[in-house]
UniProtKB/Swiss-Prot annotation:
Belongs to the PPP phosphatase family. PP-2A subfamily. It holds the Pfam family Metallophos. This is Serine/threonine-protein phosphatase PP2A-2 catalytic subunit. Its EC number is 3.1.3.16. The lineage of its organism: Eukaryota, Fungi, Dikarya, Ascomycota, Saccharomycotina. Residues 1-66 are annotated as: Disordered.
Amino acid sequence: MDMEIDDPMHGSDEDQLSPTLDEDMNSDDGKNNTKARSNDEDTDEELEDFNFKPGSSGIADHKSSKPLKLTNTNINQLDQWIEHLSKCEPLSEDDVARLCKMAVDVLQFEENVKPINVPVTICGDVHGQFHDLLELFKIGGPCPDTNYLFMGDYVDRGYYSVETVSYLVAMKVRYPHRITILRGNHESRQITQVYGFYDECLRKYGSANVWKMFTDLFDYFPVTALVDNKIFCLHGGLSPMIETIDQVRDLNRIQEVPHEGPMCDLLWSDPDDRGGWGISPRGAGFTFGQDISEQFNHTNDLSLIARAHQLVMEGYSWSHQQNVVTIFSAPNYCYRCGNQAAIMEVDENHNRQFLQYDPSVRPGEPTVTRKTPDYFL
């Protein structure tokens, strides 16, 4: 075993902008084949500056005045891309450019707080573990039959970040009212330069062009979702600058993830056993106690905060007397942590069931020339 678990109460899935693992948690198996109806609609080290500015890829230059309307040609193209990607084969650079431009014309019209109908299946971090993502869809049911909400962190650490994010974006464009993809702290130019996605793009495409396309696209991902006005979903956690959900609606999200402030906090913060607000060991965001989550839920008439962002050994973990749940959907994280993964199904009556799963069978590991920083110090 080549890692130590350092301060599990402040563990993360991995990253810090000082890294740790979360505690082992209680589990609860559940099965629910509910189908969907349509919605109405890291470390303390200094990071390199590649001088890539938001928008440098040009994918947003053509932005439309109204959402993308799929034509038969679009649908056929997307179906071909999805079939190609399902074999874990990356798209060509030209096809990535086409896909990202289509995705901008979908995502730019989504709100900071994306409204979601039940039933829905809520998913946590995936982190480039593409074969486990396919297993997730087997466990939860195929899209568009099942309505999915992903809470961020599609890239970095796993070997197949390109295929993973391409697949999810293609599914989003193909089924825009069946799948929601939120932004995680790894959907960031700065973080992906260090933790794998940038290097993977260089290795697979020979340049940073695809990385630039996707990181420009990440700026358009919604930062939160609200399931039937009762379950507030986001990647990280709460912010001392946000008391109401309406304040989230007022944020300008079309930017690189800031180093501080409310948008940063929503993607970086973690629940904690200690009350009140605390300094996060990650170096970004805050820790927040049960008193904070209870007050936020009361103020906004919520039943639950659902979030991802932290490795939990059984795939999900309740916090703050079930005011908060953490969901982690990358089994055997980093191909060595030995954790289960989970997704949470919410039915029409707001009943919640957790589906847990183990790693899928995957081919041999690809050749990787650069070792990314180890989170498990």
